């Protein structure tokens, strides 16, 4: 189940043969088209802001302001990249649904007889959807949920002065990002300019790492070599305040400059000073 078809396609191409050799079949791919966002952007933005306000226990205007500022700030200087089409294998049924929380999504999973579901870059499932699916649901979270739950990815680690994020595959439960942990792996934060560029670069590289982590967890579950880890959930975070956004921007640029300076110094050391002939 995914809202990022390219990620699902990458996962299948990379791991289909190995999973089959381990006795694991991919029953279907359910793609969330998020039709509400496409048909009414204003209602979509308000809906996201309401969820953020509820989680952060803040006012709707405040949540809406943080949402707009974060989107504009994180996308500043972003270059539009061509989106390549993704060919999902014809042998694997694929379904396009208005939302992963729709009846169509649940019916598609049940019709294919799936024993478990994986959320690849998907949105939050509602309590009723979790109950109706009625089986193990695995989700990928770009942080250690003992440190922080919620969003945005990478941001809170940057603000904490970290050099890595801890990618996590955990069970989906009603409480956000609080289900038992099935696998984790460190991913380096790629400081490369401001906070927006840093998040994008880190998450782009994390897609491959998370894909491999999902596959390893599925293989381990099938072989019964993976033991779920219960934990005390960390705090839930939402979109940051403007002051936090400014602080993260400064931290990213300082670290990016330090990395560039270090690389240049290393290059000069390796090459050595030019010698007169």
List PLM regions with ranges.
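One-carbon transfer enzymes
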Residues: 1-277
């Amino acid at each position: 189940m995914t809202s990022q078809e390219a990620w699902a396609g990458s996962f299948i191409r990379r791991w289909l043969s190995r999973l089959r050799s381990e006795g694991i079949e991919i029953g279907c791919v359910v793609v969330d088209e998020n039709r509400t966002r496409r048909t009414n952007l204003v209602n979509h933005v308000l809906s996201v802001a309401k969820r953020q306000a509820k989680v952060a226990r803040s006012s709707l205007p405040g949540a809406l302001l943080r949402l707009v500022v974060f989107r504009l700030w994180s996308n500043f200087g972003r270059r539009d990249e061509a989106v390549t089409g993704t060919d999902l294998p014809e042998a694997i049924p694929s379904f396009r649904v208005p939302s992963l929380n729709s009846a169509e999504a649940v019916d598609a999973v049940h019709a294919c007889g799936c024993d478990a579901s994986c959320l690849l870059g998907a949105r939050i499932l509602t309590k009723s959807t979790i109950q109706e699916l009625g089986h193990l649901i695995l989700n990928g979270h770009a942080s250690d949920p003992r440190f922080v739950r919620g969003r945005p990815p990478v941001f809170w680690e940057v603000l904490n002065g970290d050099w890595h994020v801890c990618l996590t595959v955990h069970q989906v439960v009603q409480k956000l990002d609080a289900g038992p942990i099935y696998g984790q792996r460190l991913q380096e934060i790629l400081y490369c300019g401001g906070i927006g560029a840093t998040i994008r670069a880190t998450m782009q590289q994390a897609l491959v790492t998370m894909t491999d982590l999902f596959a390893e967890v599925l293989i381990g579950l099938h072989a019964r070599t993976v033991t779920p880890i219960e934990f005390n959930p960390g705090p839930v975070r939402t979109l940051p305040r403007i002051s936090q956004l400014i602080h993260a921007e400064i931290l990213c640029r300082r670290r990016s400059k330090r990395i560039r300076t270090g690389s240049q110094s290393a290059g000069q050391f390796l090459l050595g000073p030019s010698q007169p002939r």
